[in-house]
Design a protein with these regions (language model features):
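Glycan-binding loop/region signatures in secreted carbohydrate-active enzymes
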Residues: 153-225
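Generic structural signal for well-ordered alpha-helices
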Residues: 67-71, 95-102, 139-146, 226, ...
Length: 256
């Protein structure tokens, strides 16, 4: 693929560079005001892209000064782009912030990445399409996004999922820690299947009369997601570094 971002916390080392992965530095947040908040970073850290979340932000205020802070930090650190890792419903303040960043990034040669809910606010930006779904197929979701935004603007946002759903499933399931998933598999010894439509592994189990569905990712499923996006002509992806860093060799053992 042409553009692979690896989201990593501040200070976490990676071997991603040998696979052509670009670091997305998870050290920044839109805080009250709004203003830019950031973790303490090594003075020499430069390059890659900034990853920005909005956890705890109340949605109030004028974002102009915050945008200046964000763009100034990009200049100081040599960041080539900004990933807006914004969860929840868009607020007017954050939509305005995205619009300002989109205009400035386009003028300054930086790339802006936004969730699909902010796509209309960033006409020059890339649109992040989550890999998570419990019905339909990932192929259909990516094809729909490529039709709406164009293949060049569409970026697959890979999530490392471990979730337990009561059946019938709807929305998101209960997150499982890795140890909890391993204990569940060891205790139940279930038949584990790979769903090509979801590009994920799953198994089912019963607790009394209630049925449950467990969906989870592995290096194989991440690779399948990337292969699918590549076949569809979608050349960008954002990967969850803390989860997949130990598996990079397995995922990228040959060129995608």
């Amino acid at each position: 693929m042409k553009e692979l971002l690896l989201a990593l916390p501040a200070g976490m080392s990676t071997e991603g560079e040998k696979f052509g992965l670009i670091r997305a530095c998870m050290a920044y947040r839109v805080g009250p005001g709004p203003r830019l908040l950031g973790a303490r970073l090594p003075a020499g850290l430069r390059g890659g892209v900034m990853q920005l979340d909005c956890a705890g932000f109340d949605g109030d205020g004028d974002p102009v000064d915050c945008c200046r802070q964000i763009l100034g930090e990009c200049r100081r650190r040599g960041f080539k782009g900004i990933v807006c890792d914004f969860e929840g419903a868009p607020s007017d303040c954050l939509m305005k912030l995205v619009t300002i960043l989109d205009r400035n990034c386009a003028a300054q040669g930086r790339t802006l990445y936004v969730p699909e809910s902010y796509a209309a606010s960033a006409p020059a930006g890339r649109v992040l399409i989550s890999s998570v779904l419990t019905h339909g197929t990932l192929e259909r979701r990516l094809l729909g996004a490529a039709e709406r935004y164009g293949k060049e603007r569409t970026v697959l946002a890979v999530e490392w999922v471990r979730e337990d759903f009561p059946l019938p499933a709807g929305g998101r399931g209960r997150p499982l820690a890795q140890e909890e998933l391993e204990n569940l598999i060891r205790r139940l010894e279930p038949a584990v299947f790979f769903d090509k439509g979801l590009c994920a592994h799953y198994f089912t189990y019963m607790v009394g009369p209630k049925a449950y569905f467990v969906l989870f990712d592995t290096p194989r499923s991440v690779r399948e997601k990337l292969d699918l996006a590549n076949r569809l002509g979608i050349r960008g992806a954002l990967l969850p570094g803390p989860e997949i860093e130990p598996h990079l060799d397995e995922i990228f053992r040959s060129d995608l």
